[in-house]
Amino acid sequence: MIKEFKKFIMKGSILDMAVGLVIGAAFTKIVNSFVDDILMPPIGMILSGIDFSNIFIVIKKGTDTLGNYNSIEAARNAGAVVIGIGVFINAIISFIITALSLFIIIKLFNKIQEKTVKKEKDEKESKEKVCPYCYSSININAVKCPNCTSDLDVK
């Protein structure tokens, strides 16, 4: 059972997935920091100094009977039930940036992969010709077809 587990873990796809998860988690932290620390503060400043992370609705007041909370953390610490609209907006923006970034990365990767496959195909085609008798693909230097054994014209 341990040997099977080692074999399973050492498969390339499992290792690729693990690396992808680690890189994805790091990338998510970078995007979240970009949204929270770089993108949203100027947008909040343009919109009359709004801090999006502190936009919230109190559904039920907490232990503080006044219910005037300066931040979502203060409301939650007081035991209030809140809907964190601003935090949700930040999460949506982070998701959109992450999805767009991944889309661009995958598109570039696919384009590079297509060029590589096309180059390999062109190289393969330049090393082969078609037998005029059986229409099999054969080496360009062949003087006799290995499939139908016909003699070929040498050019």
Curated annotation (Swiss-Prot):
Pfam families: MscL (PF01741). It is a multi-pass membrane protein. Keywords: Cell inner membrane, Cell membrane, Ion channel, Ion transport, Membrane, Transmembrane, Transmembrane helix, Transport. GO terms for molecular function: mechanosensitive monoatomic ion channel activity. Channel that opens in response to stretch forces in the membrane lipid bilayer. May participate in the regulation of osmotic pressure changes within the cell. HAMAP family: MscL. This is Large-conductance mechanosensitive channel. It comes from Brachyspira hyodysenteriae (strain ATCC 49526 / WA1).
